[in-house]
Amino acid sequence: VNQVFTGVATSRTLLGQQETVVNGLVSPTGTPGRVKISTGPLSSQSPEGIVSVETAIALLKDMGGSSIKYFPMGGLKCRDEYIAVAQACARHDFWLEPTGGIDLDNFTEILQIALDAGVSKIIPHIYSSIIDKVSGNTRPDDVRQLMAMTRACVG
């Protein structure tokens, strides 16, 4: 379940179980090790709520979250920040969902950064970059390439 940061606890409670993955959206800030948690409908319109990645992870765990959805990454535009998030997720055994601007050109590096950090579960969100603009369908060859890249990274 994709959730803004402030919606994680409500989603987990309404689900009534722990099996479903519930992510919490945090955003880059321009400073490695710091993330913006003010991603809800009201908080996103207020002064930014910026905390350490470790604090964000602890809060998400408190609320029953399974993972950080790190968005918008812009591919590798915030590479150093993404590395810090991946390292924190690994240290605190928390899953990571890199999101935003992921395509066939940067997928391997994005996945490898999280693997090298030791993240236990990585759920990359790959959106429009593998969708045919004319038909609106997912390009099967792109999916095959992504699977091959994933296998090459994880062995």
Where are these regions (language model features)?
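Glycine-rich phosphate-binding active-site loops on the catalytic face of alpha/beta enzymes
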Residues: 1-9, 71-75, 114-140
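Conserved anion-binding
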Residues: 1-76
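Catalytic cores of alpha/beta
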Residues: 7-16, 55-56, 102-118, 141-142
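Alpha-helix-loop-beta-strand connector modules within alpha/beta enzyme cores
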Residues: 14-30, 80-98, 146-154
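Charged helix-capping and loop-helix junction motifs
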Residues: 49-54, 79-86, 139-142
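Charged/polar, solvent-exposed surface patches and flexible loops
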Residues: 55-62, 87, 112, 145-148, ...
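Conserved binding-pocket/active-site segment within a compact domain
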Residues: 61-123
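C-terminal helical cap(s) of enzyme catalytic domains, especially alpha/beta-barrels
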Residues: 131-155
